């Protein structure tokens, strides 16, 4: 497989890995701290030399690759909720990258989090709140808000809402990277087998 295809599939796995966590938190009210940290860390790597630099935690990406196989492969049971979130993220990504003003604000706010990390861990509540604030202030303003399904008891909690928004920001970061690497929505229809094969090979590396 070509390096670009490998890297593009890695970025797509990054989207789905974040989406999977959104779904889990919305249903169960909690998250895997390492997986959460890996997704949030990807937002902060804005000038990578390679795509692998964005996704340092390869273990955390496994869920993303597995979702590629199940969502785009031959499995009869597709997760329509994951598909809905993915479609929403890709639509918002197009609006984001077409807005130089939004991209500029995004860069500035991410730099603020970089400075904050000299005092806090990336999964501390204050940092997650800032990631969530970026999503609310910049991304949510670009188009229709994503409707998150889950347990109402968990969804009304501020901490749950902030983790979900922070993870949606991570999904957006991966969507931007996927597009920069040549990803197009038509590939998800006409190049599904190639993407699935690449994901399956990536799972064995």
Swiss-Prot record:
The places in or outside the cell where this protein is found are: Cytoplasm; Cell inner membrane
- What Pfam families does this protein's entry cite? DUF489
In what way does this protein cross or attach to the membrane?
Peripheral membrane protein
**Keywords for this entry?**
Cell inner membrane, Cell membrane, Cytoplasm, Membrane
Cytoplasm among keywords: yes
Q: Does the keyword Transport apply?
A: no
Q: Please tell me one Gene Ontology term that the record gives under cellular component.
A: cytoplasm
Q: Which SUPFAM superfamilies match?
A: YcfC-like
SS bonds (residue pairs): none
Query: Source organism's superkingdom?
Result: Bacteria
Give the protein family: Belongs to the HflD family.
Matching NCBIfam families: PRK00218.1-2 (NF001246), PRK00218.1-4 (NF001248)
Q: What is this protein called?
A: High frequency lysogenization protein HflD homolog
Source organism per UniProt: Shewanella halifaxensis (strain HAW-EB4)
